């Protein structure tokens, strides 16, 4: 059951269609954020907090050059923080029917330039899924769930201050990094394809699986078992005293943290 959940979760994340598919043209120029190729709107410099109504959700899907702050709460809410003339270009909506997800992105055809990336502050009651595509970064204060799955594709990073879960599965494709600063997830699985790294060395776990295809590195913490499969130059560093099963093709390695 454990292996089935972890494998199925990562496969579903990899196959998930992209909501808000947009050109991800976001060069970093003089600390400005530029998005899109059409007629461009320049940010006014007047930063506002725009609170928006929304219905309940259990997942967050982010696309584009928007940063997200996730905050555990006893309610659901969303606040858009950006220039007053850019806020109308940032879309937030709940979709999905039986599995509602908060979709965050940029309106089709929008093109803008701001001094800093728009920020969407999300309060949530419960969260079981986080999908990040593009250049947006996500920061979460704490997440508590039975099963939690996460997907990063592109250059966006995800940082979680504290995670409490029974099962946790994460898939990284691209250069985005994942950092989990603390907590516990009994069963963990990570799939890395690209150059993105995982630092979950402070996320305690009992059983951990890592699959790397590329140059990404993973730091994990396992007390009983560690299964590592590496194809390429990626490395797995571990804490704890797990029983290790490893399959390596390439220059990658598995070693204990110093």
Residue ranges of model-derived segments:
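Acidic (Asp/Glu) and glycine-rich low-complexity loops/linkers
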Residues: 5, 19-133, 137-151, 162-169, ...
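Bacterial N-terminal signal peptides
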Residues: 7-15
């Amino acid at each position: 059951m454990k292996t089935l959940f972890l494998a199925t979760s990562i496969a579903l994340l990899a196959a998930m269609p992209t909501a808000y598919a947009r050109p991800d043209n976001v060069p970093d120029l003089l600390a400005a954020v530029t998005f899109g190729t059409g007629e461009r709107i320049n940010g006014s410099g007047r930063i506002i907090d725009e609170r928006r109504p929304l219905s309940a959700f259990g997942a967050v899907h982010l696309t584009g050059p928007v940063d997200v702050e996730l905050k555990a709460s006893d309610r659901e809410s969303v606040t858009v923080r950006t220039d007053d003339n850019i806020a109308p270009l940032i879309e937030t909506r709940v979709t999905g029917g039986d599995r509602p997800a908060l979709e965050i992105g940029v309106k089709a055809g929008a093109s803008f330039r701001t001094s800093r990336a728009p920020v969407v502050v999300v309060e949530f009651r419960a969260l079981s899924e986080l999908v990040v595509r593009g250049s947006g970064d996500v920061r979460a204060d704490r997440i508590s769930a039975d099963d939690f799955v996460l997907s990063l594709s592109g250059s966006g990073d995800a940082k979680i201050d504290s995670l409490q879960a029974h099962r946790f599965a994460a898939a990284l494709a691209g250069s985005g990094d994942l950092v989990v600063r603390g907590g516990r997830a009994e069963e963990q699985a990570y799939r890395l394809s690209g150059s993105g790294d995982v630092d979950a060395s402070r996320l305690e776990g009992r059983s951990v699986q890592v699959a790397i295809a590329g140059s990404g590195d993973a730091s994990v913490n396992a007390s009983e078992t560690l299964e590592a499969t590496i194809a390429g130059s990626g490395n797995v560093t571990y804490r704890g005293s797990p029983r290790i099963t490893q399959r390596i093709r390439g220059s990658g390695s598995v070693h204990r943290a110093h």
